């Protein structure tokens, strides 16, 4: 398995059944594709997927658009509602993962003193990065010793999302006064702190870098909601977006890491490529009250993914790891061990891909209803829009 700790997926506004007025199924479809891409990326680790579909930028842009729409109401109530929907699913995740970490010999770091215990509170309110052990258990155990790193990997997004939610009233006010400057400011900030020009150490630096890298995408969501690009000729928008994307690829070509063209490791390239990509997606965005044509067959899947986006996002990395001991049971079947062992080994990641979806489905049934409770809705086990 090729492991990666950069997540993807996004907390979304409380989804509604298909066809409800005001629900844009095009945006719902984009969110579903983004979640699918994130899961596949974390199984195979294909760097090129970050170029083909920059899921994180897309998710932040969609969330920014929804946030701008919500801020037509009093800001304090909107922020409270967003936090209320976000935190309970994370608390359930933490109630499972944190005891597992301690059970596998996780110990406080003496050098950090009381600060180590204070950081545990970030599993409750993740304004900072929740701590986790870099090695937990042993390599010969049921889960590989990096399982905690993989399980906690998606939590950076929760932190970034929370920062954006808290900052949105000020960001939206700035955007409506100086739209273009506000839209491009995070890209400029990334050029400073995401390239080594200025280094901010520790988790503070990581948090600021994430905020800068995806800030333009979040604010682009404001632009989409407010119709900033409606009066701009489409050819001009696409041309400028393509130049920005080209710059991102050019920058990446000179700053490749051990993972090659994985834009998750190249902040400025990620910021530029994601912004340009999202501009084009939203510039050509239709407004669908229902999925058209052949896409209609995926309506239930899209509805389910949007209703359980937080659950899928939080748990998918841990569930990917869970496929490994389950698949290893195949070697306990004598016929498989004797005749199919090499075939199973050659197709291991494909088998992981097939197995992850039933596991995600089980997790949706087991804990997904917490998203409904958090949104003050009636709990549902399988909210795919079927009546």
Regions found by a protein language model. Give the residues of each.
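Alpha-helical transmembrane segments and their immediate juxtamembrane cytosolic regions
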Residues: 2-387
């Amino acid at each position: 398995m090729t492991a990666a700790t950069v997540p993807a997926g996004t907390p979304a506004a409380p989804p509604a059944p298909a066809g409800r007025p005001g629900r844009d199924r095009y945006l719902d479809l984009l969110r579903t594709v983004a979640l699918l891409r994130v899961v596949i990326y974390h199984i195979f680790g294909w760097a090129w997927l970050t170029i083909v579909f920059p899921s994180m930028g897309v998710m932040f842009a969609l969330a920014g658009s929804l946030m701008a729409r919500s801020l037509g109401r009093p800001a304090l109530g909107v922020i409270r509602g967003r936090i209320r929907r976000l935190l309970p699913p994370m608390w359930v995740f933490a109630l499972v993962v944190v005891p597992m970490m301690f059970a596998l010999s996780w110990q406080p770091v003496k050098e950090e003193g009381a600060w180590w215990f204070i950081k545990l509170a970030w599993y409750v309110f993740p304004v900072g990065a929740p701590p986790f052990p870099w090695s937990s258990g042993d390599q010969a155990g049921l889960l590989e010793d990096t399982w905690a790193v993989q399980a906690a990997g998606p939590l950076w997004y929760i932190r970034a999302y929370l920062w954006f939610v808290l900052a949105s009233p000020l960001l939206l006010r700035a955007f409506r006064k100086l739209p273009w400057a506000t839209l491009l400011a995070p890209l400029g900030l990334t050029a400073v702190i995401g390239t080594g020009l200025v280094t901010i150490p520790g988790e503070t630096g990581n948090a600021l870098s994430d905020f800068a890298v995806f800030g333009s995408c979040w604010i682009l969501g404001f632009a989409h909601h407010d119709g900033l690009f409606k009066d701009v000729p489409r050819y001009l928008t696409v041309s400028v977006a393509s130049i920005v994307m080209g710059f991102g690829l050019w920058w990446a070509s000179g700053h490749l890491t051990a993972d090659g063209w994985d834009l998750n490791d190249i902040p400025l390239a990620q910021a530029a490529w994601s912004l340009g990509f999202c501009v084009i997606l939203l510039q050509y965005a239709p407004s669908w009250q229902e999925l058209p044509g052949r896409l209609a067959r995926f309506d239930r899947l899209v509805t389910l993914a949007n209703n359980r986006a937080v659950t899928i996002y939080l748990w998918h990395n841990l569930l990917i790891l869970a496929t490994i001991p389950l698949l290893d049971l195949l070697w306990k079947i004598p016929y498989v061990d004797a005749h199919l062992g090499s075939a199973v080994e050659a197709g291991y990641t494909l088998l992981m891909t097939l197995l992850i979806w039933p596991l995600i489905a089980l997790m949706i049934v087991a804990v997904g209803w917490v998203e409904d409770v958090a949104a003050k809705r009636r709990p549902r086990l399988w909210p795919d829009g079927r009546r």
